[in-house]
């Protein structure tokens, strides 16, 4: 049984602790720290986490909103402090500015070395195929941006990825990951083609490309 304390920030950490102990006493297994307005700063959130951990054995979860673009960061903070449940959604779909992005958080956890039983590229495809078409405005979670951040791939090389992935009919996301694993400082078309050929042999099949807007990436942005 979980209790969701909406607008947790509206009460002090001490009051939150008292309420948590009360609901735990009457049967709740877990309490949620809830950033309903998406305005909790990490150090503020951590006050609620620490007072609960130091004064009880009650499990906790976190539900964040992204009004100040901190929902994923705050989710990571709670995970590092032992949270049992983190609320997330594909494309960060949710009220107001939305919730923590499932896609982004998965790749953040992978960057931190977590071994996850999930195919992140399939997750991105599901999000693009089923969630984005339902949204009234374009999704905030762009696959190429996530992959670039995860792989530490500089976006000025996107024209190379665009050209080579089209030439070899490869998913640009997979090509970015493979190229960046080999080279981060100076990505050439020759290198990308060499890696693309190896990917093609490994896959033994054509990969359907999504319609990515490569034109929004500035070619010479490293010159600035």
What feature does the model see in each segment?
Residues 1-224:
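Catalytic cores and adjacent flexible loops of soluble metabolic enzymes
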